[in-house]
Regions:
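Perimembrane helix-loop-helix junctions
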Residues: 1, 201-239, 250, 423-433, ...
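Start-transfer (signal-anchor) and selected internal transmembrane alpha helices
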Residues: 1-30, 227-236, 351-354, 364
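Hydrophobic alpha-helical membrane-interfacial segments at the cytosolic entry of transmembrane helices
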Residues: 14-22, 224-251, 266-270, 374, ...
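Membrane-interface coil-to-helix junctions
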Residues: 24-118, 134-157, 273, 277-345, ...
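Transmembrane alpha-helices and membrane-interface helical segments
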Residues: 113, 117, 162-169, 205-215, ...
Length: 466
């Protein structure tokens, strides 16, 4: 009985955090939840229209059609609405993970819960983990893509933090949990069917594993490193195998699309790629170099592409005689053709990230810094063509994806993560000085009173101090 009570008491803060996330998710979509309003999402509406023929067929026959005449004089439906018998159980498991919450609500809930799992894998206390989850989930881009209807992208981004949590646990020596989380969330991630987001986050995973490898070499702990890599590889393989049907048909379809090899090649054309999209198309949505300031100043380039007349703050100071002119002026003046809003992480979060570069110890910091810098430079696209051309020509699959600005999702992940590591370090120092006068006077080594530094920061052979 004592053990049961002890377990309940131990899990209670995590349960309360999950309940908090449910409340926050419902609160954010309060009008839609309570008043019955519908969030108009352009891409989702367009997708519904394109798939209407298949929906009617399903309602009429009870079976899914694998072909539609509604697009391009006919095309397979498995890239419009992928559904395979082999992943039916996976879909049910994902619904359980979302607690069967309503649409829109579970998107935000999955954001919050996913990053919470990641921070708990880094051995954060529940309160700090919940705070970090809120900071990450309410980054502007993640909410903008919900409004735009980029739902598969939402799913993919929500599953990536817990996927990385599985890798972190494996490198902490918790192999069973690492295997389980890596397998489950790799399966969820691939089933989300947004290959570009998955591909982008492979850079984060690459830098983390590289940093841990260097650390393992320095400390002569390659055996433990190899075991962790093997666990992650097995988990990833399980997730991939569950989705083999989807992956195979995606690959097969890509060969016949504009992402495949072109049959007609212009001679001496610098715009062509060996196998993939054309350079102009890849870099059409490139973040401006100066536009990078939006990570901490949201309206550095004016905000979203909308008429200035809709900006209530600006109109409060404007001359009403020129309203017709304001209706024709867009408030966004950046380098992209248009945008629904800036990629904003938060000035305070960026400050903590910079502070973390100085006060956080260990290899994870360098991995997060490298991934951040790379994602920012790649997001510049046509404004930094030297690096972009190199990746298009030499990095496998990079030429398959467009809208290079979207790779800033990496920075939106790494900046809050390092910021939270820095915040934990600050709380550690504060708690140590408050609890131990010897530490405050500098006469003793500080201890960690935040219960955040055990695990990766403590006994892990790969990363003893973050």
């Amino acid at each position: 009985m004592f053990n049961i009570q002890s377990s309940i008491k131990k899990c209670l803060p995590d349960v309360l955090a999950v309940l908090l996330f449910v409340v926050l998710a419902f609160a954010y979509f309060f009008p839609a939840d309570i008043e019955g309003r519908i969030l108009y999402r352009h891409d989702a509406s367009a997708g519904r229209g394109a798939g209407q023929e298949g929906i009617e067929y399903l309602e009429r026959t009870g079976e899914r059609t694998r072909w539609t005449n509604a697009l391009f004089c006919g095309m397979p439906t498995y890239q419009m609405a992928p559904s395979y018998h082999s992943t039916n159980v996976l879909a049910q498991a994902a619904n359980a993970y979302h607690l069967w919450l309503p649409e829109n609500v579970w998107y935000v809930f999955a954001y919050l819960l996913g990053f919470y799992i990641l921070l708990r894998a880094f051995d954060f206390r529940q309160q700090l983990a919940a705070l970090g989850s809120i900071i990450w989930a309410f980054s502007t881009y993640f909410l903008i893509i919900i409004a735009a209807g980029h739902i598969w992208k939402v799913w993919a981004l929500a599953y990536l933090p817990p996927l990385i949590a599985g890798i972190v646990l494996a490198f902490r020596g918790k192999y069973l949990w690492g295997l389980l989380l890596t397998a489950v969330f790799t399966a969820f991630e691939i089933n989300a069917n947004h290959v570009q987001m998955t591909y982008d986050y492979l850079f984060v995973i690459f830098f983390l594993i590289l940093a841990w490898l260097v650390d393992a070499i320095r400390k002569h702990e390659l055996a433990r490193f190899g075991k962790a890599v093997a666990v992650c590889a097995v988990g990833a393989a399980i997730g991939v195998c569950i989705n083999l049907s989807n992956l195979y048909h995606t690959w097969q379809y890509s060969q016949e699309s504009m992402r495949g090899k072109s049959e007609l090649v212009k001679e001496n054309s610098e715009n062509q790629t060996n196998s993939g999209l054309e350079r102009d198309y890849i870099t059409q949505w490139s973040y401006g170099i100066g536009e990078t300031w939006t990570l901490m100043i949201p309206n550095a380039k004016g905000g979203a592409s909308m008429p200035l007349s809709l900006n209530e703050t600006a109109m409060a100071k404007a001359n009403p005689d020129y309203t017709s002119i304001y209706q024709q002026l867009g408030q966004y003046w950046g380098e992209q053709p248009g945008t629904s809003g800036p990629v904003y992480v938060g000035a305070f979060v960026v400050m903590l990230f910079i502070l973390g570069l100085f006060i956080v110890k260990g290899p994870v910091k360098w991995a997060l810094l490298a991934a951040t810098i790379l994602s920012i430079m790649l997001s510049w696209g046509k404004n930094f063509m030297g690096l972009t051309d190199f990746f298009i020509d030499y990095v496998p699959m990079y030429a398959k994806f467009r809208t290079v600005a979207s790779i800033l999702v990496i920075a939106e992940f790494t900046i809050p993560l390092l910021a939270m590591l820095a915040l934990r370090e600050l709380f550690t120092v504060y708690s140590s000085s408050s609890c131990d006068p010897a530490v405050a006077s500098g006469k003793a080594e500080r201890k960690d009173y935040t219960k955040g530094s055990e695990g990766l920061a403590g006994k892990s052979p790969v990363n003893r101090q973050l």
